[in-house]
């Protein structure tokens, strides 16, 4: 924005000051409105970021739980799998 210089030395001092003050007030109001709009936009971005972070935490916890369950299944599977393998090997070896 360029500075507003409405001062005319030939005009009366009071009306010149009034015009400058009104222009300054209008410019400040415009800046204030722009700042309010930016604040609202930033609030929306912050809310969206919070929502995404919450979803990511839920996904992380879900993945951790699934990995824990898979690890438990894998820990239990070799024990029962070894028993079946031994049983199959013994029963196959007997008929031969």
Swiss-Prot record:
<protein>
    <recommendedName>
        <fullName>UPF0184 protein CG14818</fullName>
    </recommendedName>
</protein>
<feature type="region of interest" description="Disordered">
    <location>
        <begin position="70"/>
        <end position="96"/>
    </location>
</feature>
<keyword id="KW-0175">Coiled coil</keyword>
<feature type="region of interest" description="Disordered">
    <location>
        <begin position="1"/>
        <end position="28"/>
    </location>
</feature>
<feature type="compositionally biased region" description="Acidic residues">
    <location>
        <begin position="72"/>
        <end position="85"/>
    </location>
</feature>
<comment type="similarity">
    <text>Belongs to the UPF0184 (EST00098) family.</text>
</comment>
<dbReference type="InterPro" id="IPR005374">
    <property type="entry name" value="BBLN_eukaryota"/>
</dbReference>
<dbReference type="Pfam" id="PF03670">
    <property type="entry name" value="UPF0184"/>
</dbReference>
<feature type="coiled-coil region">
    <location>
        <begin position="21"/>
        <end position="77"/>
    </location>
</feature>
<feature type="compositionally biased region" description="Polar residues">
    <location>
        <begin position="8"/>
        <end position="21"/>
    </location>
</feature>
């Amino acid at each position: 924005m360029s500075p507003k210089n409405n001062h005319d030395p030939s005009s009366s001092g009071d009306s010149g000051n009034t015009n400058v003050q009104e222009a300054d007030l209008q410019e400040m109001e415009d800046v204030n409105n722009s700042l309010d709009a930016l604040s609202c936009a930033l609030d929306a971005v912050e809310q969206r970021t919070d929502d995404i972070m919450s979803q990511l935490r839920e996904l992380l916890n879900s993945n951790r739980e699934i990995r824990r369950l898979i690890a438990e299944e894998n820990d239990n599977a070799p024990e029962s799998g070894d028993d079946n393998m031994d049983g199959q090997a013994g029963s196959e070896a007997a008929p031969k």
